[in-house]
C-alpha cells in the first residue's frame, strides 16, 4: 500500500532541469532549514504563486514531504490553501502553492477599528467548516493556531484560509499517538501522552476562539512544565473586566470546545450548529478597544514574524500592476520590498523563535490575576494567559544571497536554476523535515524546540510579564 502511494506521488510530479524556465522569481517570502519560499509568476499564464523550493538531502528522508504532499493533494476546500502543482529536479522539489496575500488574522483585527463577537463568530465558522472537511477526509491538522489562519486577499470580505500542513496526519483507525503541536494550543490528551484523535483540532479552535474574544490565551504560566500542567488540568476562567461584555452563548461555546475529556468535547459538526455560530446570539457590541490592546501586548509581531509578511506581497502586487501599465518596463525586475522596523511590537507563537528583549508592560491595563473561580458552566477553569535577512541590502534583494534565484549565465546558479545554495545540499546535516509555511510567516533557519515568550506571572499581588519557557513537541 505504501509503495503504491509513493508511485502515485512520483507520477504526479513534473520533471524540470531549470525551474526558472517556468517561473519568474519576484520576491523572497521565507526561508527554513530545507526550503525557501518565493513569490513567483508563471511565465505561461502570468499568474502569481508561492513557490516552496525544498532541497533534496542525504541527511533527510522524503517521508515527511511525501506526507505533506499526500495531504495537500487530497484536499480541496475554499478555506484551505491549495497545492496547485509539483515539480522535481535533481536537487529540489518545488511545491506550487496558492498565493495568500490578505495578511494575518490578528493584523486584520487591529486594522479594523471596530470589532465584535459577530466578527469573531464568522471567522470561527469558516475555520470549523474547513476543519470539518479535513476530518471527514480522515485528516487531522494538529497545529491550528492564529498564525496559520490568513486572509486570502486584502479585501474586507476576504475568506480565511488555513495554511501549513507540515504536521498534518491522515488518521489510521482514528487514533494517533505522536506528540506534536504548539504550546498553548495543544490538547490535554496530547500532553498526557495518550492516544488522541481529531478532537485535538477542536480543542485548538476553542483556544483560538477564547483569544479572539479577549486578546489573551486561556492558559499561560511562568514555565513550560507549569503551562503544560495547567492545560492537562483543563482549568481556565472568564475574568472581569475582560469578559464582562461577552455573551453567555460565546462562553458556553468555548466551554464545549475546551472540554478536557475528548469524548465529551464538541466535534466540528456540533460546534457549527451552536447558536453562537449558527444562530443570532453573537453580539454586535464593539469589543475592539479591549481586545486590540490585549492582542498588541500579548501577541506582538517581532517575536515570531519574519521580515517578509503579507504586506510585502500586497505592496509588490500593487507595484507590479503599476509597472506593467507603464511604458518601457521590463517584465522581470528586482523590486524593493517594504522595509521592516526593528522596533516593531512583537507576538509570541512559533517555538522556533528566541526572544531577547521583553516589551515594557503597560500597568494601566494588566492581564487578569491568577485567581481560581468556579466556571459558571459547571467546569473549573483557570487563568488566561529576529532573524535579520542577510539577503536584503537597503530593502532590495542582494545578488549574492543563496535565497536569490540567479539569472542564467550570472554567477553560480545551482543546477536546478533556483539558487546557488543547492550546491551544498547536505551541509546542514539535519535529519528532521522542517515544514515551513508556504505563506508569509516566520520560518527560521534553525530548528529549535524552545522559545521565550511573554507570560503573565502573579507576584506581589499584581500581574506582570516575564520571559518564560514554552516548548513544542517533536515533529512526526
From Swiss-Prot:
Enzyme Commission code(s) on record: 2.7.11.17
Q: Give the result of residue 443 to T, as annotated.
A: In a breast infiltrating ductal carcinoma sample; somatic mutation
Per the record, the GO terms for biological process are:
signal transduction
Alphabetically ordered keywords of this record: Allosteric enzyme, ATP-binding, Calmodulin-binding, Cell membrane, Cytoplasm, Golgi apparatus, Kinase, Lipoprotein, Membrane, Nucleotide-binding, Prenylation, Serine/threonine-protein kinase, Transferase
Under the GO molecular function aspect, what terms does this record hold? Answer: ATP binding; calcium/calmodulin-dependent protein kinase activity; calmodulin binding; protein serine kinase activity
Which EC class is this protein assigned? transferase
Q: How is its activity regulated?
A: Activated by Ca(2+)/calmodulin. Binding of calmodulin is thought to result in a conformational change and leads to activation through phosphorylation by CAMKK1.
Q: Where is this region: Autoinhibitory domain?
A: 277-317
Let me know which tissues express this protein, per UniProt: Mainly expressed in brain with small amounts in skeletal muscles, kidney, spleen and liver. Strongly expressed in forebrain neocortex, striatum and limbic system.
Q: Where is the active site?
A: 143 (proton acceptor)
Any one of the GO CC terms: Golgi membrane
Q: Does the keyword Zinc-finger feature in the UniProt annotation?
A: no
Q: Which residue spans adopt a coiled-coil conformation according to this UniProt entry?
A: none
Which reaction is recorded as catalysed by this protein?
A: L-seryl-[protein] + ATP = O-phospho-L-seryl-[protein] + ADP + H(+); L-threonyl-[protein] + ATP = O-phospho-L-threonyl-[protein] + ADP + H(+)
How is it placed in the membrane, per its record?
A: Peripheral membrane protein
Q: Modified after translation how? A: May be prenylated on Cys-473.
Domain of life of the native organism: Eukaryota
**Sequence segments annotated as region (Disordered):** 325-352
Report if keyword Zinc-finger is assigned. no
What does the domain comment read? The autoinhibitory domain overlaps with the calmodulin binding region and interacts in the inactive folded state with the catalytic domain as a pseudosubstrate.
Q: What is this protein called?
A: Calcium/calmodulin-dependent protein kinase type 1G
The gene it comes from is CAMK1G
Amino acid at each position: 500500500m505504501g509503495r503504491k502511494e509513493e508511485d502515485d506521488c512520483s507520477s504526479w510530479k513534473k520533471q524540470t532541469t531549470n525551474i526558472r524556465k517556468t517561473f519568474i522569481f519576484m520576491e523572497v517570502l521565507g526561508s527554513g532549514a530545507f526550503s525557501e519560499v518565493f513569490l513567483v509568476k508563471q511565465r505561461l499564464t502570468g499568474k502569481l504563486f508561492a513557490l516552496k523550493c525544498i532541497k533534496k538531502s542525504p541527511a533527510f528522508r522524503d517521508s515527511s514531504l511525501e506526507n505533506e504532499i499526500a495531504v495537500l493533494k487530497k484536499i480541496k476546500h475554499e478555506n484551505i490553501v491549495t497545492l496547485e502543482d509539483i515539480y522535481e529536479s535533481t536537487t529540489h522539489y518545488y511545491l506550487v502553492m496558492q498565493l495568500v496575500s490578505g495578511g494575518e488574522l490578528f493584523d486584520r483585527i487591529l486594522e479594523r477599528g471596530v470589532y465584535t463577537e459577530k466578527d469573531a463568530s464568522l471567522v470561527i465558522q469558516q475555520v470549523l467548516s474547513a476543519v470539518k472537511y479535513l476530518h471527514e477526509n480522515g485528516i487531522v491538522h494538529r497545529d491550528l493556531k492564529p498564525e496559520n489562519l490568513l486572509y486570502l486577499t486584502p479585501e474586507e470580505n476576504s475568506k480565511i484560509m488555513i495554511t501549513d500542513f507540515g504536521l498534518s496526519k491522515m488518521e489510521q483507525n482514528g487514533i494517533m499517538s505522536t506528540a506534536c503541536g504548539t504550546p498553548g494550543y495543544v490538547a490535554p490528551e496530547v500532553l498526557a501522552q495518550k492516544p488522541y484523535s481529531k478532537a485535538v483540532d477542536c480543542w485548538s479552535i476553542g483556544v483560538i476562539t477564547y483569544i479572539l474574544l479577549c486578546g489573551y490565551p486561556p492558559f499561560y504560566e511562568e514555565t513550560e512544565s507549569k503551562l503544560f500542567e495547567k492545560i492537562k488540568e483543563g482549568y481556565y476562567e472568564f475574568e472581569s473586566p475582560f469578559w464582562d461584555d461577552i455573551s453567555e452563548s460565546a462562553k458556553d461555546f468555548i466551554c464545549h470546545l475546551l472540554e478536557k475529556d475528548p469524548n465529551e468535547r464538541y466535534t466540528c459538526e456540533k460546534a457549527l450548529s451552536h447558536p453562537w455560530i449558527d444562530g443570532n446570539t453573537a453580539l454586535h457590541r464593539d469589543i475592539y478597544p479591549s481586545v486590540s490592546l490585549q492582542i498588541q501586548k500579548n501577541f506582538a509581531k517581532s517575536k515570531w514574524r519574519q521580515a517578509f509578511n503579507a504586506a510585502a506581497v500586497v505592496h509588490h502586487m500593487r507595484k507590479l500592476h503599476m509597472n506593467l501599465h507603464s511604458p518601457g518596463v521590463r517584465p522581470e525586475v528586482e523590486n524593493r520590498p517594504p522595509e521592516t522596523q526593528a522596533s516593531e511590537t512583537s507576538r509570541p507563537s512559533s517555538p522556533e523563535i528566541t526572544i531577547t528583549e521583553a516589551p515594557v508592560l503597560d500597568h494601566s491595563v494588566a492581564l487578569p490575576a491568577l485567581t481560581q473561580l468556579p466556571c459558571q458552566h459547571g467546569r473549573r477553569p483557570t487563568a488566561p494567559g529576529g532573524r535579520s535577512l542577510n539577503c536584503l541590502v537597503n530593502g532590495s534583494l542582494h545578488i549574492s544571497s543563496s535565497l536569490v534565484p540567479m539569472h542564467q549565465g550570472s554567477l553560480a546558479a545551482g543546477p536546478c536554476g533556483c539558487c546557488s545554495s543547492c550546491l551544498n545540499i547536505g551541509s546542514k546535516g539535519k535529519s528532521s523535515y522542517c515544514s515551513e509555511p508556504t505563506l508569509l510567516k516566520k520560518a527560521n533557519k534553525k530548528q529549535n524546540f524552545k522559545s521565550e515568550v511573554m507570560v503573565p506571572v502573579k507576584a506581589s499581588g499584581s500581574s506582570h510579564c516575564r520571559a518564560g519557557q514554552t516548548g513544542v513537541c517533536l515533529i512526526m
